[in-house]
């Protein structure tokens, strides 16, 4: 074998080894939905669920709930309004709203009614029933239950990053607003701070 051929063979072997080292093995592990999987440091399903649980629990412990029930002799009717994403991330706000709705409904302390999008769909169904459904099964309009309070709020972030380390600060603000007089009967705030470090691999 000539010296030139030997060098060529050596280069080819190194190239093959390098390509083999670039391969990625895909591994998928099925885990319980309740398990915390914080891979990127971004807002995730665990954050959404835990914040919704904590904030609804806090809201329902404040005096407005007891005061209303005592004055009216019934549970207050609550609807969830908009939650605005003011963060630097793409956050599934609808997932968070759904978590809030679940916690409010399952608390059995308030009567929960459908939000605007759902109401529009149901109203369309009633209109179609008036045309296509039999008279004895039609649902008449004008019998909806109006909400007494609306829960709405914002999600914001503050980002700090240096030398491969990133700190993300999430702040969720929610308010319970009396729909009759616009007074805010509860204001809650939940904060989450995450530190994400990028590990450098030395070959």
Q: Residues of each region from the PLM?
A:
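Phosphate/oxyanion-binding active-site loops and adjacent basic polyanion-contact surfaces
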Residues: 44-56
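Sec-dependent bacterial lipoprotein signal peptides
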Residues: 1-22
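N-terminal segment of the mature soluble domain
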Residues: 53-54, 58-132, 181-187
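Bacterial Sec signal peptide processing site at the extreme N-terminus
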Residues: 18-42, 202-203
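Short, surface-exposed secondary-structure junctions/capping segments
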Residues: 131, 198-203
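A short, hydrophobic beta-strand-centered structural micro-motif
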Residues: 54-59, 77-83, 132-161
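Amphipathic beta-strand/beta-sheet edge segments enriched in Tyr/Trp
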Residues: 23-28, 148-196, 200
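Second-shell loop/turn segments in exported
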Residues: 37-46, 83-91
């Amino acid at each position: 074998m000539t010296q030139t051929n030997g060098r060529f063979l050596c280069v080819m072997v190194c190239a093959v080894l390098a390509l083999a080292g670039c391969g990625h093995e895909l591994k998928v592990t099925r885990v319980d939905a309740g398990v915390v999987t914080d891979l990127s440091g971004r807002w995730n399903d665990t954050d959404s669920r835990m914040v919704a649980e904590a904030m609804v629990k806090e809201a329902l412990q404040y005096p407005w709930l007891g005061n209303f029930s005592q004055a009216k002799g019934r549970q207050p009717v609550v609807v969830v309004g908009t939650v605005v994403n003011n963060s630097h991330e793409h956050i599934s706000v609808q997932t968070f709203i759904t978590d809030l709705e679940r916690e409010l409904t399952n608390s059995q302390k308030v009567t929960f009614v459908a939000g605007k999008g759902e109401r529009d769909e149901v109203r369309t169904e009633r209109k179609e029933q008036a045309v296509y459904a039999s008279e004895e099964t039609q649902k008449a309009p004008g019998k909806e239950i109006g909400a007494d309070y609306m829960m709405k709020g914002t999600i914001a972030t503050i980002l700090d990053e240096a030398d491969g380390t990133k700190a993300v600060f999430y702040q969720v603000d929610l308010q319970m607003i009396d729909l009759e007089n616009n007074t805010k009967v509860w204001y809650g705030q939940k904060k989450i701070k995450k530190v994400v470090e990028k590990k450098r691999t030395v070959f």
